[in-house]
């Protein structure tokens, strides 16, 4: 097979190895679950290749099939997330590294970012709580910040309101990468109360970022336990 065939099916290249994804994401994991995902691998080198992910965190396991790929061959790595081993609610991030050849070192070229989002467990809430839940409302879920020079920063404010019937708790607030910073005035909102969420984009960190900068919020609103705010911002050449 001509290696060029894989540019469409496996668009991401790490050395002579091509992959179908550049990051490993487990979007909505519930405690106790063991979700899996597959990373498709193509060997465009002229040597036999053994797909290995290095530096796996304790909550991930990986199995490659077949264990060895001949030249021009494809296979897959099945990755399993053990949610019981995640350290906390909300977002956990790490980096794993694809071994390109035996004895390969870890570095930026073969880094694959990992993210897992563990949702709160609502199975134990009472009937009373179920009938009178908090309800989060945001003034915006997507921010347009345009272009930023490397020495610039820009901030936007979102109003967070509890339009529900019991206290709203922001259990976790995190950014997916270093291009953003967040500040939240209040973590607990009584029914009818609101607060300000300030999101700042930093031009100097934008160049290093893969994907869309995002903010993650985990709440005790059973209908909106996870909220992702996307920030459209690019680095000015």
For the regions a protein language model found, what residue spans apply to each?
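Beta-strand-connecting loops/turns
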Residues: 32, 72, 89-90, 151, ...
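Short, hydrophobic beta-strand segments
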Residues: 77-85, 197-205
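Short glycine/proline/serine/threonine-rich loop/turn segments at secondary-structure transition edges
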Residues: 85-93, 205-212
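Beta-strand-rich extracellular modules
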Residues: 99-103, 202, 218-222
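Beta-strand-rich interaction surfaces with strong enrichment in secreted/lumenal proteins
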Residues: 27, 64-69, 83-84, 146, ...
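Surface-exposed binding patches on compact interaction domains or structured appendages
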Residues: 45-74, 165-194
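Long, low-complexity ectodomains and other extracytoplasmic segments of secretory-pathway proteins
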Residues: 1-45, 102-159, 163-164, 222-237
């Amino acid at each position: 097979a001509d290696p060029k065939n894989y540019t469409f099916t496996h668009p991401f290249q790490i050395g002579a190895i091509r992959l179908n994804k550049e990051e490993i994401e487990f979007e909505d994991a519930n405690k106790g679950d063991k979700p899996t995902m597959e990373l498709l691998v193509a060997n465009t080198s002229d040597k036999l290749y053994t797909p290995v992910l290095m530096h796996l965190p304790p909550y991930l396991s990986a199995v490659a099939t077949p264990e060895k790929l001949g030249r021009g061959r494809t296979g897959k790595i099945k990755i399993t997330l053990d949610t019981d081993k995640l350290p906390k609610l909300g977002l956990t991030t790490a980096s794993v590294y694809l071994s390109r050849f035996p004895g390969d070192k870890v570095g930026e070229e073969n880094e694959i970012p990992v993210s897992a989002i563990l949702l709160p467990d609502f199975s134990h809430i009472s009937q009373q709580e179920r009938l009178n839940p908090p309800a989060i409302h945001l003034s915006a879920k997507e921010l347009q910040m345009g272009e930023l020079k490397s020495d610039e920063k820009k901030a936007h404010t979102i109003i967070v309101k509890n339009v529900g019937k019991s206290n709203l708790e922001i259990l976790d607030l995190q950014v997916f990468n270093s291009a953003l910073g967040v500040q939240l005035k209040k973590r607990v909102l009584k029914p009818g109360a609101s607060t300000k969420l300030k999101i700042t984009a930093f031009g100097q960190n934008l160049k290093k970022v893969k994907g869309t900068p995002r903010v993650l919020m985990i709440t005790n609103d059973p209908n909106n336990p996870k909220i992702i705010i996307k920030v459209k911002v690019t680095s000015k050449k």
